[in-house]
Structures are given as C-alpha cells and as structure tokens.
Amino acid sequence: MSKEKASIGNGPGGIGRRQFLGTAALAGLAGVVACTDKGAAPAAAAVGAPASGAHGAAHGAGASVHLKPGELDTYYGLWSGGHTGDMRVLGLPSGREILRIPCFVPDALVGWGITNESKKVMGARPDGTLRYTVADTHHTHASYKDGNYDGRYAWVNDKINSRIARIRLDYFICDKITELPNVQGFHGIFPDKRDPVDTKINYTTRVFCGGEFGIPLPSAPTEDAGKYRSLFTCVDAETMAVRWQVLIDGNCDLVATSYDGKLAATNQYNTENGAHFEDMMSAERDACVFFNIARIEAAVQAGKFKTYGDSKVPVVDGTQAANKDPKTALTAYVSVPKNPHGVNASPDQKYFICAGKLSPTATVIELSRVLGWFDGKQEKLDDAIVAEVELGLGPLHTAFDGRGNAYTTLFLDSQLVKWNLDAAIKFHKGDKNAKYVVDRLDLQYQPGHVNASQSETVAADGKYLAVGCKFSKDRFLPVGPLHPENEQLIDISGQKMVLMADHPVRGEPHDFIIFKRELVRPKQVYALDDFPLAIKDPKESGVFRNGRKVTVKITSQAPAFSLREFKLKKGDEVTLILTNLDKIEDLTHGFAIPKYNVNFIVNPQETASVTFVADKPGVFWCYCTHFCHALHLEMRTRMIVEA
C-alpha cells in the first residue's frame, strides 16, 4: 500500500475557536503524526471559501422549525442512542423526540428485559437472566427498495457486545437481535440496496457489518497484535442469521453499499494492525476496502472458506495476499489518507466519499473504476480516486443534498463545509480555478455525524440537515458536570447554510437517518392473533396449576383487570399472561407487582407475559402503571401469596 505523505494544511480561523480540542489533539499527536503546512496553502484560501463563521448571524433566517399545536412533522428521524442502548425516533424539522425503542438494554417503561417475549429477543441464560445489560448503539440504517427507503425495517448496532438489532417499522419495535461471532467492536453497518446478480431483487436482503477491533482468530490470550484480525460480516435481512464473513488486512470502521448491489466497502483507520495509539497512526495512508459481493458468495457456495472456533459461519480470505489477481479478487484496497473516519455513498450512485480525520482531506472514489479494476480493465486501483481535496481540520462524515453538493463535518474546526463534487474533481485534475468549497458554517461544538433529509437515497431532497455535536458547553442551562450533547438542525435548501435550532440530547447519540413520513405505514393497534398466548375472552382468565408451576391468565379493558384477585403459594413458579382487549389506539395498559420487580405494558390487542417465583408471602396490589382511564387509580388487582 502506498505510504505517500499527505500534506496537512491549516484550516480557516484562529486557534481560539478550536483551542478546546484542536490544540490538545494536535499536541497529543506530536512525534506520532507528522503535521506540516509546507507545500499546502490554507484550506479556505486554496479554494476561495468564505471566511469561517461569515454568516453565523443568519441563525433563524431559514424555514421555521416551530410547528403549531397539532401540526405534524414532515420527516421521521431514526437516531442511535449510544450507551443507552436504544434507538430514538424524532420528528423533523421540529426535533421533537417521539419515541425511544428499547433494543439491547432493559427498559422499565415498557418492560423490555422483564417480559418473556423481550427476553427471548434480547437473549437470556437458562435461569432467565439477561446475557447482557449494557450496550452502545452507533449506526442506524433502514431497508431499501429501488434506491429509496421502503419502510420495512431499520437496524442498529451494539458496539460493546457485537450485536445487531432489527426494528420493525410497522410497530416501531425491536423484533430480532443477532450476536456476530468472532467480532469485537462491531461498528459500521449498512444494508444492501439490491441483489448484485438477480435484477428482480430490487430491495434489501443483506446487512453488512464491520468489526473494528482486531482479535486473535480463533480466540486466544495472546499479546502479539500481529495475530489479531478483523472480519467483515454479512447478515441476512429477513432471518437475521449470519450468512458469511470476510477475513481482511487491517480493521473495519464504517460501511457503505453501492446502489447496484455489487459493492460494499469499509474505511480503515488501522491498516497497521496496531494495538497502541501511536501504532494506529504510523502510516500516512490507510484504505477503503471494497467487497465484491457476487464473488464472495460464489466462493462460499464453492466451499472456499474456513471457520473459526465454535462458529459454523463460513469465512473467506479477503487479505491482499490472497487477492492479487483483479479478475478473481474478492476484495480491493483503495488507499486513502490518514485514519479515515467515514465512507458515504453519493445519491447519484457514482461515488464513495472517505473523510480523512487526521488528514484535512476528503477522498472521492469512483465506483465504476473500482468495478473496472475487478474486471481487469483498470490497471491501477488507486486510479479510482478522482478527487482528494482539502476541506479543513478533522473531517469525519459526509451527507448530500441531491444537487451535487456534499456536506462534511470538521471536528477540530467545529464547522460544516459544503463542497461541490464536480468542482472537486476538476480541481483534482489540475483546474486550480475550480472553487469546490461552496460554504462554511460554524457549529457548537466539535461535530461528528451528519445526515440530511433522504441523503442516503436516490431521492435526496436537500432540505434539512442534522449534525450531532459532541460538546454543548455553553449552549444550554447548566445541569452539573454531565452536559447534554447538542443536535443542530440546518437549512440547506439555499446556497447558504442556515443554522435553525439547537436541541439538547441525552448522551450519546451517534448516527441517524432522516426520511419522509409517507415512506412508513405505522400500525397503532396490534393484531390479537399475532400473539400465540393471547387471551381472547375475559372468561378464559384464571389460575391454572400444574404442580408448583402456575399460569395466571388476565385480560385488561380500561379501567379493570379481569381478575379481581388471584392466589398463589409461596415457592410457586408463576407465569402471568396479560392481554389488552381494548381496540382503541393509545389505550396502553401497564402491570406492576410491588416487591417483585415486575412492570411492563401491553398496547391495544397486545399480549405479554412474565415469569417469576412467588417467594414472598403476603398481599401485593398489582396496578396499572400507564394512565388509560379516569378511574386509573382504581385499576388494580390483588396477588395473594399464601405461606
């Protein structure tokens, strides 16, 4: 891989604006990262960009984010929750949080991790306790049809325990979770957009997952980082089973997929395969690894794979040594500068963009040239790079407006830069008069992920853009040491970007998607027959004993439970089943048992169950925790446990 030096230019603005992190970050890299401005003009001056913050006073000049009472948002947003382990549903442009979807960690409001049904999804030990109770969700993405979202599913990763959760977008609930084998630090995630071979399959059937942390394969307690490897994983979108994995050189970070289904890719910040801070930054160029999906699946079909440990998942060899011949290669490593932190697919279906992080550059890779290399028609793989241009300090993630412009966050500069892809390509070819930077906007502060309305689809509409700022500092009322993060909304419908709103959010969201509300068709009342344990008539209620195992069947219709009381014996193993027979939307019922650590909800026509041991004798008032009626306080029943 090329080790060419990437010159690092100075971003616009003075040191004061980036002093909080910029100075510390650059000082921390002294002696590790060679940072120099020799041979490189300042990024803003090189492209004739407007001065940093020149129109920061335009705050509020864009379209209004205020909605009148009863007025609905025009877009949904799906946000990762970070180490709250959930997915969050927002309405845009208002920025109002509508729902939190529990996924990987318990949630006391809905009883996630308490009910038997949720434990089955989350994964439990033989004794009924959860396998994991912490998580770190980073990236959310949704299923596609014909290059646009189809409203079926969304997915989110858990970086801590290498799990992927699927969300049904009809009910906005998590219905499946899969743990990836032989992977640590599962970070990037992206669904495919169509099948690479069968043109009739114009929708998502695979979800690709990147393993960030190299580990010994098979697992072993070795300190030799040279033996650590990372795997790129394919999960079946319907069954959620792991289809196959690819062994690679270096690591995986984020993931992107092409619109024709032929390619997936992951950017790499640790091609050195280093275990320590300085080792991971020693190379001046890292890579974006492309995966030829059809060839990988043909290799699996032909039995050209191995397995690791107890896993039966086929693993093909995607290392550079095993893929030197382009015409048979499964992978292709395009070099990019230095420690890139993001790869994003442009809505015109032509390019992948890698942001440099430790380089002030963004790299534009033309997909047709990558495919040309796989076909033996492109002699040098790095000739797929059609632009590599300076944007500013700390470029991380990129969004698109569908008009040929890209929007990249600059972490150290605390800016969003709007730049034109065609102009960047012209500049890279030698036209130094091409002004590729269109606009800059100061953000508050240290922006990370960014996305725009419909940005990652063929229907990118260039109206709104959201950015997740990792530090809020002075933007909100102080609440002690733990600050909220700052999610900012920006109007990108005009030539100039306009900051519209700040929103404090509980830490720590990462990535998100924004899509038109008409693309989903939510159901607000369940189908009773979808639940095998459903109690369809209150007359079916009762206590049913089989030795020391007892089943209690109860229905609820506001404002009463079907059983006024029920009796148990100390030591009974109890499974309590509750069905909400109300058919009106928003009539959700709760069920709590004091001293037994039980609380859960049932939505209209939903059935849920809990299992516990009646180990405390006495009278316990089970009551409805979710307000549903004027006689809400009277909605209770007695559980009597006899000694």
Swiss-Prot record:
Pfam annotation, one family: nos_propeller
GO MF term (any one): copper ion binding
Free-text comment on the cofactor: Binds 2 calcium ions per subunit. Binds 6 Cu cations per subunit. Each subunit contains 2 copper centers; Cu(A) (binuclear) and Cu(Z) (tetranuclear). Cu(Z) is thought to be the site of nitrous oxide reduction.
Cleavable signal peptide: 1-46
Binding site for Cu cation Z4: 510
PROSITE patterns: COX2_CUA, TAT
Catalytic activity: N2 + 2 Fe(III)-[cytochrome c] + H2O = nitrous oxide + 2 Fe(II)-[cytochrome c] + 2 H(+)
Binding site for Cu cation A2: 624, 626, 628, 632
Compartment(s) where it occurs, according to its Swiss-Prot or TrEMBL record: Periplasm
Function noted in UniProt: Nitrous-oxide reductase is part of a bacterial respiratory system which is activated under anaerobic conditions in the presence of nitrate or nitrous oxide.
Protein name as annotated: Nitrous-oxide reductase
UniProt organism field: Cupriavidus necator (strain ATCC 17699 / DSM 428 / KCTC 22496 / NCIMB 10442 / H16 / Stanier 337)
